């Protein structure tokens, strides 16, 4: 039985990198794939060690104090030690998860920790096992846990039909995973994601003054890194609450600088007048319809700040064509009918 690697320093994260999904244009088919709902929240790695709990962000920052209810629930699991991978998200009354609601304590949404993988349990390196076995053990571990921890269920095969159903229900998209593979840190072909609407993180490089009755800011000027150069991606002027407009202004004014960080500097015809450049340290998530031919966002809408992402890591996401991300060129047929996408099973 493989054992989990010992660490010389207790403050070190239990693994060097999380497994990440590659964006694709089409969900894979075939019984070798299982499909899960894509949650709209913060990726969190939960580490349990003899009753003590540590919650780590995607970049392994200690976020235990951010989600005390999650930490308490993890501490009550029936294991001496465990490492769980999942996503903390706010669940709306209609069952969908909302990143905006997660950032707004007054949204009325309830907080849940959706767990979809088990990396270690009682000293055993479960991450070396096939995903299907890991999920079976995970479900056993959390089935009697407090309601804040929720098991992320899945369906087998029929990925495209499952994706279409997810989009009809207003979900962000789906994650498809090879059921026979171990947990492989980094971004690779055994986990792929298909999105109903394009969304990605973008760096805030400036803002414009508000007009009319609007307060705070008018719009955000955003971009992404291409090598060491920050490329302009567009102007985001929708998706803000009044409180968020004021919060953004308070964050951006201290970051103002004389020169644009964008290369090349966008013309005023693209940004509008009354623009202010800022040091590009803040990252936001933006939903949009498509990329235009000149590399700008079409119909963008702001979704929220991403304090779990570094600006320098933000690049333009380009989906791979089906068949180039570990998907089979000739999908294997499956007799199993797709289940409706459920948020979770307790």
Show which residues each predicted segment covers.
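Catalytic cores of nucleic-acid ligases and guanylyltransferases
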Residues: 1-346
